[in-house]
Amino acid sequence: MRVFTATLGTETDTNSPIPTGWRAFEDTMLWRPGQHPDQPTEATGPLWACRRRAREHSWSVVEGTCAYAMPGGPVPQPVYETLRDEILQQLRQALPVDIVALGLHGAMVADRTEDCEGDLLAHVRALVGPEVAVGAELDCHAHLTQRMQDEADVLVFFKEYPHTDYVERGEELLHLLECTRRNDIQPVMHSTPCRMLAAFPTRSEPVRSLVAEMQALEVAPILSVSLVHGFPRADVPDAGAQILVVADRDEALAARVSGELAKRVFAMRRRLRSTRPPMDEAFAQALARPERPLILIDADDNPGSGAAGDSTAVIRLLQAQGVQDACLGPLWDPLAVRFCFDGGVGALLRLRIGGKVGPDSGAPLDVLAEVVALRRDHFQSVGGVHAPLGDCAAIRFGGIEVVLSSVRDQAYDPSLFAGLGLNCAQRRFIVLKSIQQFHLGFDAITPHSVVLRQPPRSAASYTHLPRPMWPLDEDFELP
């Protein structure tokens, strides 16, 4: 088998003021052929599966560009088209191939292309023709469009959130594409909207049992079942949760199973409704809890969902209550980092931190802070892969330690603090800019956490979303 593989993706918050331009890709992942490290990453499961087949089954693998950016605002059209066309030119030079296996996200929006994945897949199909098996592995926080299904033979989405199964899903994709190319199967896909904007954490019920049920259904002729969670921070026509079923030759079966599962997901909607109190109330509850350390999740300022990661709202809560034993990170503020490097370790600086990017960032915070540590090219360790944070500074003021980063990312692992000499396990509160992915590393320190967040967006903030859509609309049923 001769296979071409490449990656192109990001997760777009259509209301974010942060353009996902060249710097965003360079800071996260912009690897040309031959530059991909020898570890799998969340965005390159198909490439990893291809490499294994090259070693074990003598496949011929052509690796294209791998480009992936931290979630942010829409991708400038010239950036998207340049990366897309670079991958297409690499594919053109690799022809003929038997398989094209892509690592995509599913929620990438450019300023003039709402469905980047569908657009890329259409260009790939136009290049390779109908006989080549074309497929993609995607993040479950995706917008599944009909164009994506029309242009691909197989689409496989992560089942787990936090995303721990990207290697397994990459292997699943390659297996199905190989079987397709050998004519052992003829995959057909059918999706059913669940008409929901919701979070589906797979570590807890009721979603844990749903994932197990989906896996149990994957017996021939059912080839693959995915819950596409959707990405609620995007206002696009295909937003919202969906069920995708891939079956061998039997589209009616795929339609029936996806419809049944979609109704089951819709029926659990009230169990998924957030019952978390407002931020101030949740923080008051955290103050009364005995666990030490206790993780406070700054969920509204999670860069992994497209937020800036520069809000100081939780720091203000800590200060208002006189908390003297807390650490927070990462707070994205390249200018403050630069000032810290200018001052050096031990310097006492008047810094204005955070609150720089847009309305959701809130106000900046003026502090008199000691620079306690500096590190060039800091990173977090995520499954053996480095998640870059760029140049970083650790500062301390009023008993609060803050990790300032020059590259925007969410919190994954205690190496965020340890790499700067901070022991977060000894603090009363560990404040993390994350939602779910922090479990990957911080559960080893403590399983106890409190989510701090503001009320969700109102219905008025969506103009392109299909309606009805729960919880924006309450009184309706799925057909």
Predicted regions and their residues:
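Glycine-rich phosphate/diphosphate-binding loops that line cofactor/substrate pockets in enzymes
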Residues: 56-63, 89-100, 282-294
